[in-house]
From Swiss-Prot:
Primary gene name: purM
UniProt GO cellular component terms: cytosol
Example of a GO biological process term: 'de novo' IMP biosynthetic process
Name of the protein in its database record: Phosphoribosylformylglycinamidine cyclo-ligase
Primary location: cytoplasm
Annotated localization: Cytoplasm
Reaction catalysed by this enzyme: 2-formamido-N(1)-(5-O-phospho-beta-D-ribosyl)acetamidine + ATP = 5-amino-1-(5-phospho-beta-D-ribosyl)imidazole + ADP + phosphate + H(+)
EC number(s) recorded for this UniProt protein: 6.3.3.1
Enzyme kind, highest EC tier: ligase
Domain of life where this protein originates: Bacteria
Family statement: Belongs to the AIR synthase family.
Pathway(s) the chain acts in: Purine metabolism; IMP biosynthesis via de novo pathway; 5-amino-1-(5-phospho-D-ribosyl)imidazole from N(2)-formyl-N(1)-(5-phospho-D-ribosyl)glycinamide: step 2/2
Length: 346
């Protein structure tokens, strides 16, 4: 091997192994708080081991992956990195939840040009917080320092979740019928979708991100983390026959609800049947956005849709309210008209 004085190291090329090691030590306590008894082994192995919980008699594994999108651009602009990790977890765990799956474990991918240990630790602390809210274990991840790939101070995130449900308890929407009721659970804000438009409207309006917006700094309103519905919904599934659910993400209400409806049925959602947060009214006003565009771009205050029989509405609302969720009866399922969309807002 060459041992000349002018040899070049990996660090000289822009990859700081010591910084990566320091990050691992910083985040170990965060990950430890998320552990479940089914986790076998600790952080640092080549693979993560997880024993399927014995409570599942005929388990089906359900997986999901997602990112945070251009909401990260606002995080860079505001130097606010403590909540985007919650967003990352929420986007995946809420997705598999709609099929009746309990999230079991989560992995993350953090990519940057130059690793800033403090920033990365804030992000991972948020990921761990999201995992705690979801009851799933943060069992591993990848930190990729790639010089020249990202602008200074920027990074990208991806998350991966695996959950499980008993095969006969999977929810696919196939039992949804005319007369069923559409319940909407409140969102925390824009969650993690529509942020390319949000950022454009912020730029066009010239709004001061530090200004007061209905009693909160505007920056906190637009950066509010995606709500995680796992624990309340899992309790609901134990008590009530849920026919279908939709996580309201990219595509808004009108594009996501149809994903769980059988052919020939339409969800008729009643405009004004729930409280729309001021942020969405502000966005609509700044961009002169049509109602139709709002409902297919943003969640407009509804982060999760639950479809149940009319006879189960009162019990479902009571249980969800007791778990801290704000829930409204926002529509009904009916026969689909000729040429009609599967979700309409009237």
């Amino acid at each position: 091997m060459n041992s000349e004085k002018n040899s070049i190291s990996y660090r000289d090329a822009g990859v700081d192994i010591e910084a990566g090691d320091a990050l691992v030590e910083r985040i170990k306590p965060f990950a430890k708080r998320t552990m479940r008894p089914e986790v076998l082994g600790g952080i640092g192995g080549f693979g993560s081991l997880f024993e399927v919980p014995k409570k599942f008699k005929n388990p089906v594994l359900v997986s999901g992956t997602d990112g945070v999108g251009t909401k990260l651009k606002l995080a860079f602009q505001l130097n606010k990195h403590d909540t985007v990790g919650i967003d990352l977890v929420a986007m995946s765990v809420n997705d598999i939840l709609v099929q009746g799956a309990e999230p079991l474990f989560f992995l993350d991918y953090f990519a940057c040009g130059k690793l800033d240990v403090d920033t990365a630790a804030q992000v991972v602390q948020g990921i761990a917080a999201g995992c705690e809210q979801s009851g799933c274990a943060l069992v591993g991840g990848e930190t990729a320092e790639m010089p020249g790939m990202y602008p200074a101070g920027e990074y990208d995130l991806a998350g991966f979740v695996v959950g499980a449900a008993d095969k006969d308890a999977l929810i696919d929407g196939s039992t949804i019928a005319e007369g069923d009721v559409v319940l909407g659970l409140a969102s925390n804000g824009a969650h993690s979708n529509g942020y390319s438009l949000v950022r454009k409207l912020i730029d066009l309006s010239g709004v001061d991100l530090e200004s007061d917006f209905y009693g909160r700094p505007f920056r906190d309103v637009v950066m509010a983390p995606t709500r995680i519905y796992v624990k309340p919904i899992l309790k609901l599934l134990q008590a009530i026959k849920v026919k279908g659910m939709a996580h309201i993400t990219g595509g808004g209400i009108t594009e996501n609800v149809p994903r769980v409806l059988p052919e020939g049925l339409t969800a008729e959602v009643r405009q004004g049947s729930w409280e729309i947060p001021p942020l969405f009214s502000w966005l609509q006003e700044q961009g002169n956005i049509t109602d139709q565009e709002m409902y297919r771009t943003f969640n407009c205050g509804i982060g999760m849709v639950v479809i149940v029989s009319a006879q189960d509405v009162a019990a479902a609302k009571a249980l969800l309210s007791a778990e801290g969720e704000q829930v409204w009866e926002i529509g009904r399922i009916r026969a689909q008209g000729a040429g009609e969309a599967q979700t309409v807002v009237v």
